[in-house]
Amino acid sequence: MTTVQEAVPNLIPTQDVTPRPAPKKVEAGVKLRGAEKVARIPVKIIPTEELPKKPDWIRVRIPVSPEVDRIKQLLRKHKLHSVCEEASCPNLGECFSGGTATFMIMGDICTRRCPFCDVGHGRPKPLDLDEPKNLAIAIADLRLKYVVITSVDRDDLRDGGAQHFADCIREIRALSPGVQLETLVPDYRGRMDVALEITAQTPPDVFNHNLETVPRLYKAARPGSDYDWSLDLLQKFKQMVPHVPTKSGLMLGLGETDEEVIEVMHRMREHDIDMLTLGQYLQPSRNHLPVQRFVHPDTFAWFAEEGYKMGFKNVASGPLVRSSYHADQQAHEAKIKL
């Protein structure tokens, strides 16, 4: 089997003796990004000298419109965060211009150090108990019909933040009874049972948790996470709330092979996952995991065809696809087929 170092040549194990700066002490509320964020991960990242040139099929419109500014102002007004901004999503302009956003709850500081992600790492502040109400007010102000709620990882919380998700769902439904809610949850490491018990009592309309990459690359891309744990989380939720569609996604371009992607897709179906997203990984900075390949649109289309053959109710597969991209359309198609 190909080693992580062979598949991802810009990564070196931590036993490498090359001198590097001492990791910065993490203080509560201080956000670490870039080199400081990834200083303690198991596999060292050598900063990329130059970001790779994107192919012609990856072109993103600059997000400039009155609607983009309006939504940003509304988020600041209610002390909210959008994953669109925090994770530097390439679809920010399209989604904001269309009057939609994916909300990120429980702060903007994550307890994990995933080197593909542009969200900052650190010791989070205590939960904002007013956030569920503020989120509900913002969604009502925007008159949204479909909302995606995600979060940073909160390994500091006994339930991983599951109760906060439930509180947000209740507040939103109280002010916007017709809204459909998709939650994109963390893996609830070490807290699966308690988190799922809470979630099952106040379930979303779609339950989403991303596998992100193939198991061979987990040590490099998802330190602190476990591939089989994530699959079990999705399957156990489905067993508890069988009428709610489950969803997961992968980034392509981290060093995986097409065969590995197909194998993960099969494992997803074995764990009763209904919906799939596949998108191109784009390196946020020179201190993040390097892009190993740009997957051609034809290959994304082939993955979609294979996914439907496997029985997925909906497959969104393309270079700029992200978990919440056109999530309302995905959910509509999936529920029609359930």
Swiss-Prot record:
Cell location: Cytoplasm
Binding site for [4Fe-4S] cluster 2: C110, C114, C117
Keyword Cytoplasm part of the UniProt annotation: yes
This protein's record includes keyword Ligase: no
SUPFAM superfamilies: Radical SAM enzymes
One Gene Ontology term, aspect cellular component: cytoplasm
Cofactor(s) named in the record: [4Fe-4S] cluster
Swiss-Prot/TrEMBL keywords: 4Fe-4S, Cytoplasm, Iron, Iron-sulfur, Metal-binding, S-adenosyl-L-methionine, Transferase
Any one GO MF annotation of this record: metal ion binding
Reaction it catalyzes: [[Fe-S] cluster scaffold protein carrying a second [4Fe-4S](2+) cluster] + N(6)-octanoyl-L-lysyl-[protein] + 2 oxidized [2Fe-2S]-[ferredoxin] + 2 S-adenosyl-L-methionine + 4 H(+) = [[Fe-S] cluster scaffold protein] + N(6)-[(R)-dihydrolipoyl]-L-lysyl-[protein] + 4 Fe(3+) + 2 hydrogen sulfide + 2 5'-deoxyadenosine + 2 L-methionine + 2 reduced [2Fe-2S]-[ferredoxin]
EC assignment: 2.8.1.8
Pathway terms, separated by semicolons: Protein modification; protein lipoylation via endogenous pathway; protein N(6)-(lipoyl)lysine from octanoyl-[acyl-carrier-protein]: step 2/2
UniProt cross-references to InterPro entries, sorted A to Z: Aldolase_TIM (IPR013785), Elp3/MiaA/NifB-like_rSAM (IPR006638), LIAS_N (IPR031691), Lipoyl_synth (IPR003698), rSAM (IPR007197)
Residues in Radical SAM core domain copies: 96-313
Amino acids binding [4Fe-4S] cluster 1: C84, C89, C95, S324
Region of interest (Disordered), ranges: 1-22
Recorded superkingdom: Bacteria
Co-factor: note: Binds 2 [4Fe-4S] clusters per subunit. One cluster is coordinated with 3 cysteines and an exchangeable S-adenosyl-L-methionine.
Recorded family membership: Belongs to the radical SAM superfamily. Lipoyl synthase family.
Protein name in UniProt: Lipoyl synthase
Gene name as annotated: lipA
